[in-house]
Amino acid sequence: MQIVIDANTILSGLFFPGNERRLLVASLRGDLTLVYAEDVVDEVYAVIERAFHDHPDLEEALARLESVLAAGVLVERRRYLNAIPRWSEQLRDPEDAPVVACADASGADGVVTGDRDILESRGLEGIPRYRTRELLKLLGLARK
């Protein structure tokens, strides 16, 4: 299963224990393949630089990030760039369009996010959207 992941889900998994971290670990085990929009990777690094630059676990988080990126699939912006305007019109927050455009362009099996704008948008029929807990359950990886 190939799933596009958004920046907040990645950041949560890098810096905090919980379902998001379990999802990143599952990707390292090969239980699923995480798909990264180039815009999302850029956003993750920008947020780390801005908000986590003095976090006590920064080095460990950066090493974890490099591992999960290497285990996944990076989708270059040029592959989904033309789809961004169309998806921007379907979303309450146009800033979320690269995530959905990447899912569309890459043929991924869905998107994992905690972003309500993506989860609740009515214009995204055909693109499955999952909260992290739902996806872990679907994969048989949820905590009992």
Predicted regions and their residues:
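Short, flexible helix/strand-to-coil boundary loops that buttress conserved ligand/catalytic motifs
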Residues: 15, 27, 48, 122-125
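Glycine-rich, phosphate-binding/catalytic loops in enzymes
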Residues: 20-23, 52, 128-130
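PIN-domain endoribonuclease scaffold, especially VapC-family toxins
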Residues: 26-33, 38-86
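Short secondary-structure boundary segments
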Residues: 38-39, 114-116
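Active-site neighborhoods of divalent-metal-dependent phosphate/nucleic-acid chemistry enzymes
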Residues: 73-110
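Short, active-site-adjacent cap segments at secondary-structure transitions
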Residues: 10-11, 42, 118-120
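Acidic, PIN/NYN-like endoribonuclease modules and their adjacent C-terminal/linker elements
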Residues: 93, 104-109, 116-144
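Short, well-structured N-terminal submotif of metal-dependent ribonuclease cores
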Residues: 1-36
